[in-house]
């Protein structure tokens, strides 16, 4: 069974539609959604409804930092423009949509797979995995073979061998990647709604 893992949708309806259509055309039957469904984009209500519908059909979903900010209100430490986006987004959502975002867990586990928006060592701290050191720290925080997270907006894979040797690489689109079971893997799929790798297409 093929599983589509997507993250950082950021209220971008056009990108979400394209990615969902593509995943379905590739035979995706399971869905994992790694948070940040709102923020930046113009269609938060539509995107939240799509995510909620997938969750009702059995998808796994976790909360992102933008989802939390919209639910709890803008932090005083946020820049003025970021606070404005949070407040605007909140005003676009009805009570049921806000309740859905508030109900999302920080992490989920399915067998030997761990799902989180930012990292596994402090999910609610929203620290980024910017390199091998953070990736290893995240992998050490769980006994799962595979960890999936978003937040970075650029696709990357990290791996850790049984003797503690770490490596990383950027995946090549359309090329299958073998995942040897003697390694732990940390997978960052990229971003649907706001990629930051220089490619305007959704990751």
Which residues are covered by each model-predicted region?
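Hydrophobic/aromatic beta-strand patches that form the interior of the parallel beta-sheet core
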Residues: 32, 60-62, 116, 148, ...
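Binuclear metal-dependent phosphoesterase catalytic core
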Residues: 172-203
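Core catalytic region of metal-dependent phosphoesterases/phosphodiesterases
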Residues: 2-6, 11-100
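His/acidic metal-ligating clusters that form di-metal
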Residues: 26-27, 92-161
């Amino acid at each position: 069974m093929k599983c589509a893992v997507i993250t950082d949708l950021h209220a971008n309806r056009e990108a979400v539609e394209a990615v969902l259509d593509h995943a379905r055309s590739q035979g995706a039957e399971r869905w994992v959604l790694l948070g940040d469904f709102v923020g930046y984009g113009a269609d938060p209500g539509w995107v939240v409804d799509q995510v909620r519908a997938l969750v009702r059909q059995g998808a796994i979903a976790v909360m992102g930092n933008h989802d939390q900010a919209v639910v709890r209100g803008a932090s005083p430490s946020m820049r003025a423009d970021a606070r404005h986006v949070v407040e605007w987004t909140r005003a676009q959502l009805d009570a049921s949509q806000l309740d859905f975002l508030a109900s999302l867990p920080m992490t989920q586990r399915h067998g030997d797979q761990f799902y989180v928006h930012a990292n596994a060592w402090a999910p609610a701290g929203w620290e980024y995995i910017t390199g091998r050191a953070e990736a290893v720290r995240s992998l050490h925080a769980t006994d799962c073979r595979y960890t999936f997270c978003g937040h970075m907006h650029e696709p990357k894979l990290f791996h850790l061998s049984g003797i503690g040797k770490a490596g990383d690489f950027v995946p090549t689109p359309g090329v299958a990647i073998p995942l040897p079971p003697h390694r732990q893997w940390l997978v960052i799929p990229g971003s649907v709604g706001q990629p930051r790798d220089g490619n305007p297409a959704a990751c």
